[in-house]
Amino acid sequence: MSGRDVIFVVGMSRSGTSALARVFSLCGGAIPLELLPPNFANPAGYWEPRHAVEINDAFLEAQASSWHDARLTLQLRPTFGPLQERFMTEIVEILARGFQPDGPIVVKEPRITALLPYWTAAAVELRLRPVFVHIFRNPADVAASLFARDGLSVEHSFALWLKYNLIGERDTRGLRRIFVSYEEVMHDWEPVVARCAAEVGIEVGIDDAIRSAVGDFLSPALHHHRASAIDETAVDPLMVAWVARVYAVLRRASEHRIRMSALDQILCDYVDSGRADASFLAPTA
């Protein structure tokens, strides 16, 4: 296993993480041996390890959190003790034994974006070579999708979008990484995969059979829940402004112009405002 690439698909839920993970697997990546099954919200499949969802959920729940906890408490004030040590052991087991034996390992599970230090450390412990592909999507489209699937308010969805994208960027600095947009993948996936290969060394193979398979998978039906379906007028104007600024930075990042200082300032302003720990952002039953 030493020296094998592990591709972490980083990003917010409903941002194309499933689609991108499947594209990488069709291009030669190793998928989980036990997949989370598809359902009404993702009929084309999630392409994520079922056990990863289970251990991530349990780890978050043990700390009064969840995937839809938009607060930044665990990310800004991390602790390490028996709970975290056990979690690391479980991650190592999944990465070591939970994937097909050949090709770069493709790890997609949106909760991982909020827990990247643990998953990165586990990969390094196994002497895997982590690489991070950060996919982002128009935040209004994400909010529309989360409302349709989970009934989340626009403001809650925007706060989640901020959390996952700001933390996902912060926790991959200095590591092999690349930023891509959902729209790029859906419009023309092949240049995106080629760019990942060229810029961060992901080993992929593309031939006519793969082009056909990916083309069949990336149907227009996957691109649903557009921004026109939501109303931003009731959202805190500061939240709207922060989301817009982060989205602009990420779009430039996909063109190789990442402004980390701008993202640092937004995160600082967001935390200082008190909104990052607001009670309405906490998980609900």
Protein language model regions, located:
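PAPS-dependent sulfotransferases, especially Golgi type II membrane carbohydrate sulfotransferases
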Residues: M1-S2, A198-A285
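PAPS-dependent sulfotransferase catalytic domain
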Residues: M88-I206
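Generic detector of well-ordered alpha-helical segments enriched in charged/polar residues
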Residues: V53-L60, M88-A96, A140, A144, ...
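A structural signal for well-ordered alpha-helical scaffolds and beta->alpha junctions
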Residues: T17, G45-P49, Q84, M88, ...
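Glycine-centered secondary-structure boundary/capping sites
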Residues: N56-R71, R127, G151, M186, ...
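Proline- and acidic/polar-enriched loop/turn elements at helix boundaries
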Residues: L36-P37, I135, D207-I210
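A polyampholytic, Gly/Pro-enriched intrinsically disordered region
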Residues: I55-L60, G151-L160, A227-A234
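PAPS-dependent sulfotransferase catalytic core
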Residues: M1-M88, V214, P220
